């Protein structure tokens, strides 16, 4: 992104102002209450991660206050790890300590679990995704890039999940040619839940009333391109839809910004519906919470992962919905327990899914981080030695272990 511009950001509202300058912040979190600091803390990924990647590469500079009062002013490209895998860090008493970066292998999939480590990395990359455990970020400089001249939101409908996955794989292979920025999946049970929401709430549901009766599942797309390439990109997309058994005539599409936002809300209405469903159950079972997975698998393993999810959930007799960032091979399985026994079973399945996904080379925490509830998964992914190396990084930046108690590490 040679034309990228730097921008000091204190809030996502400030980032929103970039749109008037034909610029945008590519991580583009889908949660409207997100903050820039929050997105940096967990290396957030929005729907547009498919094309642009997560938060980390768009963080150009950080000012960080460490737990012992030291202040670091870090800049990408200036403060980097030496080829030896080491860097110098000033200590509180004015000395310098040699710090070695971890040697574990970072997943090639989306991943927000643990401290990033890679050869030639920038020191600020430790803080992006560290969940507040290494320092308090007080200032952030992010990169914005030119916004596409033309944008279109499209919802495609499919009569089988197999069609939808095959369509997605074709888009993944031709992402540059087709100018697709986001690919979001709404599975069969999820689409049924949205239909029920429309029936109950009508026009206030955020779900259009013209859902095709034959639709088994849906895929939401964002297309962004130059003005000159726009018509050609949409024509090619229509061809790909037809090639996979879909019908462009049943698709929804929107070009104007307000209409695009309406289609985006169609996808975002789903987690709102799930949360409302769980809230209703909690009236009689207050110990229940939603169990939402956050796992990504390598390319070519998505069908296998979906099969594992569905088979285990069916065998356990649990209710669930599947949706999410299918373009990144990153689907959210939301398990919907009806009582405490099902909740315990759901947690057991959650751990089984994590083991299976890591065995494929994927991540059990693709975008939401580890937090305080999933510390077991950090060890599942990086094993005892990897966690030990992370604790050494933690000790270098936070020697008194004052920050983020219980986060990442049990």
What are these regions (language model features)?
Residues 375-410:
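Activity-critical C-terminal alpha-helical subdomain
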